[in-house]
Amino acid sequence: MVNMKASMFLTFAGLVLLFVVCYASESEEKEFPKGMLSSIFAVDNDFKQEERDCAGYMRECKEELCCSGYVCSSRWKWCVLPAPWRR
C-alpha cells in the first residue's frame, strides 16, 4: 500500500514538473518573436506621430479629451461612440 502511494505521488510530481518545463519553454518561444518584431519595427523619435489634442476611438480619456463625435465612457474611461443609453 505504501509503494502504491509513493508511486502515485512520484507520478503526480513528474506530471507537475513536466507541465512547468513545457510552460517555461512555451513562454520563452512567445517572447522571442515579440522581441524580434519590436527590434525590426522599432520607431525612432523622428518618426513618432505627434500627439493629438483629443483622444480617438477606444483611447484612454480623462474628463473631456475625446475628439468630436466621441464621449468619455464613465465606466471604462475610453472614448466611445455616443449612444442614447450613454447619456
Curated annotation (Swiss-Prot):
Residue ranges the record assigns to the propeptide: 25-52
Listed InterPro entries: Huwentoxin-1, Huwentoxin_CS1
Source superkingdom: Eukaryota
Matching PROSITE patterns: HWTX_1
Location in or out of the cell: Secreted
Signal peptide: 1-24
SUPFAM superfamilies linked to this entry: omega toxin-like (SSF57059)
Keyword annotations of the record: Disulfide bond, Ion channel impairing toxin, Knottin, Secreted, Signal, Toxin
GO cellular component, one term: extracellular region
An annotated Gene Ontology molecular function: toxin activity
Expression (tissue specificity): Expressed by the venom gland.
Disulfide bond positions: 54-67, 61-72, 66-79
Function: Ion channel inhibitor.
Family membership: Belongs to the neurotoxin 10 (Hwtx-1) family. 51 (Hntx-8) subfamily. Hntx-8 sub-subfamily.
Free-text note regarding domains: The presence of a 'disulfide through disulfide knot' structurally defines this protein as a knottin.
Name recorded for this polypeptide: U3-theraphotoxin-Hhn1e
Species annotation: Cyriopagopus hainanus
